[in-house]
Amino acid sequence: MTRIKICGITRAEDALTAALAGADALGFNFSKKSPRLVSPDTAREIIAALPPLVAPVGIFVEQSAEEINELCRYCGLQIAQLHSDEYGAEATMRIHGTKVIRVFRPGPGFSVNEVRTYAKQTGCRGFLFDAFSPEMAGGTGKTIESSTASMLFEQTRDIGWALLAGGLNPENVADAVRLINPWGVDTASGVESAPGIKDARKITSFIQAVREVDRMLTAAD
């Protein structure tokens, strides 16, 4: 079953909508440059009200490992998603008590060996592949070319579990799951009416599309 993460949560009602619709994880963005920035107090309040078995994920771009540890503790985050290239092996290994998802954005000069080296050095087994953009670390709405995405997932299945992000929405997510077979999918702008404001119908449609293609693929097996 494909895991589903709804990212860029800023409101309690959006978190509850996503959780009740079947999302496996919710992302809370702490990057000061993000239009989906959420305060630690707001994130803490939303996370405290989540149903069991919905994993809260912290999105980090410029914070130090020590800041990440403190935010995870204070807010109740279960996973730290690291977006900056500055989060190398040394910084990652200073993050304690929280699982890590490391984001890679295949751009000019990118090699899948970067993922394999990072995994070997840190023991990290969670990855997210997002579309490259020099302007933003994520949530751009840009997509990864399907052949590139397929190659990334095929060449990293033996070292961990990876999510696909980048321009996914209710209209294209089923094709992405069918063609690429990611362990999970991640969306932010694809289920919004405005940055940080989720659309309940889009969230529900997105999750339904993933579950339907999962059923079709299972039946085909």
Curated annotation (Swiss-Prot):
Its EC number is 5.3.1.24. It comes from the Bacteria. It is an enzyme of class 5 (isomerase). CDD domains: PRAI. Pathway: Amino-acid biosynthesis; L-tryptophan biosynthesis; L-tryptophan from chorismate: step 3/5. Keywords: Amino-acid biosynthesis, Aromatic amino acid biosynthesis, Isomerase, Tryptophan biosynthesis. It comes from Chlorobaculum parvum (strain DSM 263 / NCIMB 8327) (Chlorobium vibrioforme subsp. thiosulfatophilum). GO terms for molecular function: phosphoribosylanthranilate isomerase activity. Coiled coil: none annotated. GO terms for biological process: L-tryptophan biosynthetic process. It catalyses: N-(5-phospho-beta-D-ribosyl)anthranilate = 1-(2-carboxyphenylamino)-1-deoxy-D-ribulose 5-phosphate. Belongs to the TrpF family. This is N-(5'-phosphoribosyl)anthranilate isomerase.
